[in-house]
A protein has these predicted regions:
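Active-site residues of response regulator receiver
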Residues: 57
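Non-catalytic signal-transmission and effector/linker regions of two-component phosphorelay proteins
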Residues: 1-8, 101, 112-128
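Hydrophobic/aromatic residues positioned on beta-strands within the core alpha/beta folds
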Residues: 84-87
Length: 128
């Protein structure tokens, strides 16, 4: 069981199998989950609901994770520290600098369910 049960999580993932696996894993561990298939859907959900953590694929067609993050920074700045990027590729070394030096957690695939849950708990435990 996670340290922080009942966390409200928005999963933004264009790959259906990955999105469903994240949804299942997080729900199985006691969290509330909404899913979006792209950045535009995510922005609509952000306008309607409150979230503790946003898990976003970094590389998506259309609005990618970086664009979504910038929109979150402008529209919901209190949520920017709650974003976690999920990616199969390693970000380039200048990646953190693009966000003003703020450490944006990156969960690199493949990862274990335990690692996923630990990253979420770490984000929620941060004093933001």
């Amino acid at each position: 069981m996670p340290v922080n049960p009942l966390i409200n999580i928005l999963v933004v993932e264009d790959e259906p199998d990955t999105r469903e696996l994240l949804d299942f894993t997080l729900r199985w561990n006691g969290h509330h989950v909404d899913t979006a298939t792209n950045g535009r859907e995510a922005l609509a959900l952000l306008g309607e609901h409150s979230y503790d953590v946003i898990l976003s694929n970094l590389n998506m067609p259309g609005m990618d994770g970086e664009d979504l993050y910038r929109r979150i920074e402008r529209g919901w700045p209190h949520l920017a520290p709650r974003v976690v990027f999920v990616t199969a590729a390693r970000p380039n070394p200048s990646f953190r600098a693009q966000y003003g030096g703020r450490p944006v957690p990156v969960l690199t695939k493949p990862y274990t369910p335990q690692r996923l849950l630990q990253v979420i708990d770490d984000v929620v435990a941060r004093d933001v």
